[in-house]
Amino acid sequence: MSPKTETKASVGFKAGVKDYKLTYYTPDYETKSTDILAAFRVTPQPGVPPEEAGAAVAAESSTGTWTTVWTDGLTSLDRYKGRCYHIEPVAGEESQFIAYVAYPLDLFEEGSVTNMFTSIVGNVFGFKALRALRLEDLRIPPAYSKTFQGPPHGIQVERDKLNKYGRPLLGCTIKPKLGLSAKNYGRAVYECLRGGLDFTKDDENVNSQPFMRWRDRFLFCAEAIYKSQAETGEIKGHYLNATAGTCEEMIKRAVFARELGVPIVMHDYLTGGFTANTTLAHYCRDNGLLLHIHRAMHAVIDRQKNHGMHFRVLAKALRMSGGDHIHAGTVVGKLEGERDITLGFVDLLRDDFIEKDRSRGIYFTQDWVSMPGVLPVASGGIHVWHMPALTEIFGDDSVLQFGGGTLGQPWGNAPRAVANRVALEACVQARNEGRDLAREGNEIIREASKWSPELAAACEVWKEIKFEFAEWIPCNQ
C-alpha cells in the first residue's frame, strides 16, 4: 500500500488499543430518569487508574470494544454508550473503588432480564484490566420496569387466595430431600399440613428422578393437600417443583399442576434461567397459580465480596422476571446473614418505593411503581426458639420455612407442625399485645409451651442447638 493510500484510509480513524476514559469516563454527566444505573465494586490490575478501569467497565458492558472500528461512524455513540459518571473509594480498601455507570434505556430489550444481564454482567467480568468486579446494585427506572409483568400475583392477591392475614405464613421442606417414594413423600406432606403449616415444599433438588417421577409426586401431593384441607378447614399448598430440562417440559408440569387444582408451583430460577422463569411466571398469572422461587446456585454468584453480583441485584431481577416467593436468608440460624443488609433487599422485594440507604447496601432509590411485591422466605437451620426473632425481623409479609426444624423432633410430622404453629401464634399475639419480642421472646415461647405439649417437646429438642463454625463464612440459602 502506498503512503498516499495509507493517509487517505486513516483520515478520522486510528487503529490500536484505545484509552477508554477518553470516551466513556464522563464525570460531568447528569443521569436521566430513564437510565439504568449500576454500582460496580472494581478491583483493577496494578497500574490501571480508577478512571480507566471504570470507563472500561462502562465500555465493555455497552458499546465499546478494545479498539476503534470503522462502523463506529455509522451510529451515535453518544446516544448509546454507557458512561462511568462517578467514582468513589471503598472504605478500608486501598485497591478498590465503586464505579457508577449509567446505561441508556435503548440498549436493552423490553421485558427481558436475560438481555439486561447479558450486557451488564457479561464479558466485562473477564476483562484483563480488572482483577475482580462485583455488581453491587442496579437502579431500574420505571420506564423499564413497566415493560415487565413482574410477580404472577403478589403479596395481597396471595393472601386473598389463601384467606390468611395478619401473620407470617409457615412452610416446611420435606426431608430427606432425595430418596423417598412418591407415596411416602405425599404422606409426609399430609402430616405437616394437617398439623398446621400453610405450605410444604419440594426441595430444589427434586425434579423427576428414578426413585420418584414428577407426575407421581404431583398426584400424591395433591391428595395430601385436599385431605388436609378437608380436615383443617384451611387452604393448603405444596410447592410442586416444575423445574425441568427444557421450557416445554417445565410448562407441561405446570399445566398438570393446574389441572390438579393445586394453588402453587415452584421454580429454581438461577439454574433454570431467566428466560424459563419469565415464561413460567407468565403462565402462572394467566392460569391462577402462585409461583415459589428457590435460588439454588446463588452463592456461586454472590458469595465472594469482590467478584460476582450481590444478591440484592438477583432479588431485583427476580421481581422483574416474576415470582411470588423467594428464599432470602434468615439473619438467624445456620445460614445467618447481616441483618441490615438482608432487610435491605427484603424491602426491595416487598415495598413499592425504597430510599437510597448505604448502611443497608442500597445504592440507589428504587421506585417499582405498581409492580407487585414478593414474599421473602426465611429458611435454613431455624426452629421454634427462633420464632420470636423471625417474627420481629421479617414481619407479617414473609414465609417462615422450617425443614429440619419441623421434621427433626421425635413425635412425628404433625405434632412438629403443631409446635411451629403454636409458637408462631403465640409470638403474633404477644406482638399485638405490645410485648417486645426481641427482649421477651424466650419467655413467650416458654409460656406457650405450658399448654402445648407439642411445643414443649420441640423446645426440649432444640434448646441446645447452635450453629458455630470456626473460620466459617456464612452464606444464605
Curated annotation (Swiss-Prot):
Modified residues (N-acetylproline): 3
Reactions this protein catalyses: 2 (2R)-3-phosphoglycerate + 2 H(+) = D-ribulose 1,5-bisphosphate + CO2 + H2O; D-ribulose 1,5-bisphosphate + O2 = 2-phosphoglycolate + (2R)-3-phosphoglycerate + 2 H(+)
Binding annotation for Mg(2+): 201, 203-204
EC numbers on record: 4.1.1.39
Location within or outside the cell: Plastid, Chloroplast
Residues that bear N6-carboxylysine: 201
Enzyme class: lyase
Propeptide segment residues: 1-2
Residue numbers annotated as active site: 175 (proton acceptor), 294 (proton acceptor)
Residue(s) at site: Transition state stabilizer: 334
GO biological-process terms attached to the record: photorespiration; reductive pentose-phosphate cycle
One matching Pfam family: RuBisCO_large
N6,N6,N6-trimethyllysine found at: 14
Cofactor(s) needed by this chain: Mg(2+)
Origin: domain of life: Eukaryota
Chain sites annotated for binding substrate: 123, 173, 177, 295, 327, 379
InterPro entries found in the cross-reference section: RuBisCO, RuBisCo_large_chain_AS, RuBisCO_lsu_C, RuBisCO_lsu_C_sf, RuBisCO_lsu_fd_N, RuBisCO_lsu_N_sf, RuBisCO_lsuI
Post-translational events: The disulfide bond which can form in the large chain dimeric partners within the hexadecamer appears to be associated with oxidative stress and protein turnover.
One cellular-component annotation, GO: chloroplast
Record note on cofactor: Binds 1 Mg(2+) ion per subunit.
NCBIfam families for the chain: PRK04208.1 (NF003252)
Note: The basic functional RuBisCO is composed of a large chain homodimer in a 'head-to-tail' conformation. In form I RuBisCO this homodimer is arranged in a barrel-like tetramer with the small subunits forming a tetrameric 'cap' on each end of the 'barrel'.
Functional note: RuBisCO catalyzes two reactions: the carboxylation of D-ribulose 1,5-bisphosphate, the primary event in carbon dioxide fixation, as well as the oxidative fragmentation of the pentose substrate in the photorespiration process. Both reactions occur simultaneously and in competition at the same active site.
Subunit text: Heterohexadecamer of 8 large chains and 8 small chains; disulfide-linked. The disulfide link is formed within the large subunit homodimers.
HAMAP family for this protein: RuBisCO_L_type1
Name of the protein: Ribulose bisphosphate carboxylase large chain
Species of provenance: Persea americana (Avocado)
